[in-house]
Amino acid sequence: MTDKPNNDQRSDLTLASRRSFLKHSIIAASGVALFGGMSLGMRSAAWAAGGDVETSKAKLGFIALTDAAPLFVAAEKGFFAKYGMTEVEVLKQSSWGTTRDNLVLGSAKNGIDGAHILTPMPYLISAGIVTPNNQPVPMSILARLNLAGQCISVGEEYRDLKIGLDSTPFKAALEAKKAGGKKVSAAVTFPGGTHDLWMRYWLAAGGIDPNADINTIVVPPAQMVANMKVGSMDTFCVCEPWNAQLINQKIGYTANTTGELWHNHPEKAFALRSDYVATNPNAARALTMAIMEAQQFCEKAENKEEVAKICSQRKWIGAPYKDIVDRMKGNFAYGTGKVIENHP
């Protein structure tokens, strides 16, 4: 199934039945009910010994991004095993399209049970909007992995414009480039995903029609920098460490963080197939508790450097430590002289 955001896909995303979408949104949000009114301490005590998990197995997907760190840390620090999930596989996916395809398959068909995922995707998958033959695959969101933390970056050729939150100066530059017979492109990671939404909003706010004035292309996160380097795009929206790497390689700079567009917006989620949750509710709780404990570890300032080192490992993100650590600590150098420290 192609992930190119063609006109038909845009129409599907816009015109999908509101009733159907709301119905499946309720399904996707159903994971909240797993914990009821239990306090975090009560949950931890209940599952510290593994409880009575129905299975110790789960296959979880992730994309090479720093907001997947809770899954890496849960695996590295033994948090999955602590809660009885001793056979968890955390598996790198090549793209969000691959994540979608493997969730549709499920682990019984050599796919995955759950994933670190763009927040809109469980809803879109549950509603059958982005699945083969529009077949709904019910999903459950178990946890919010992070808020904000993404960036929109632009290529080095636009350095003199110092493009920021206001994309208006970008419009004239793109028009001039097109007048010279060259293509202009904006890269996102998945049609209808958060990066797609932030990019479209930012462009449109500056008078750039994302459907008519610029080509919108889908590029996997880990391939953004390489594609910018060879001139395949003019701007992209993605999570770290790829924006920082772009700057470190002197290929471009950060125009804005997505938190500047919407403060503390929901970003990635931890989601499972709803049939896994229904069959293994205790295991689903255990997985969520492990990830929540990993999140608490990641949030502590004294652990940031260790988490960055974990993320840099080849089996996880596989990017240099220097491309990860500063922004993980909340220190954002935009590559234009603008610096924000202690960014949440």
Predicted regions and their residues:
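Ligand-binding pocket segment of bilobal, Venus flytrap-like solute-binding proteins
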Residues: 112-114, 218-254, 273, 309-327
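Signal peptide processing junction and immediate N-terminal pro/mature segment
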Residues: 39-49
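Short glycine- and hydrophobic/aromatic-rich loop-to-beta-strand nucleating segment
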Residues: 152-153, 269-272, 276-277
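Extracytoplasmic/secreted proteins, especially bacterial periplasmic and envelope-associated proteins
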Residues: 75, 98, 102, 194-201, ...
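N-terminal secretory signal peptides
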Residues: 1-20, 34-35, 43-44
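Sec-dependent signal peptide hydrophobic core
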Residues: 25-33
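Short, glycine-/small- and polar/acidic-enriched structural segments
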Residues: 48-211, 215-218, 233-244, 251-264
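Secondary-structure end/capping motifs
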Residues: 279-344
